[in-house]
Amino acid sequence: MNYYSAIIKRYQERIGTDKLPRITIESINMYHMFRLLDAQQYDKVAGYVGAAANNLLKARCDFGLMCGNTPHLLFDQIQARTDLPLLSIVETAVAAAQQLHLQRLALLDTKFTMQSDFFIKPF
């Protein structure tokens, strides 16, 4: 889980090496989500991921992250199903690209992400 290690490293760089952040992970079955996407059952995908976000809310998390690009295909629909603030990987990527003055970016991902324009539009 590279993202977990990266979060810990960055946190300790900022806060101190003798500290660790409290992190709650709600892992979903991506294969189930992919089957729902293949069947174009987008409302069920939003409900499935939204329910996971609500589990994080019940765990008293301050915000949520979806560590894959593909769920962001339905970011607004998922956010509408939970009161937990979700951070958008798309908005974060746009902000980082602008800050670094990047003009051409590459994206490697699932067929669902690659066949959609949700990641291209903001750029």
Question: Residue ranges of each PLM-predicted region?
Answer:
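Short, acidic/small-residue loops that bind anionic groups at enzyme active sites
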Residues: I15-D18, I78-Q98
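Metal-dependent catalytic neighborhoods of phosphoester/phosphodiester hydrolases
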Residues: L36-L37, F75-R81
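Generic structural signal for hydrophobic
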Residues: N55-L56, I78, A97, F123
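Short, glycine-/small-residue-rich phosphate/pyrophosphate-handling segment
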Residues: L102-F123
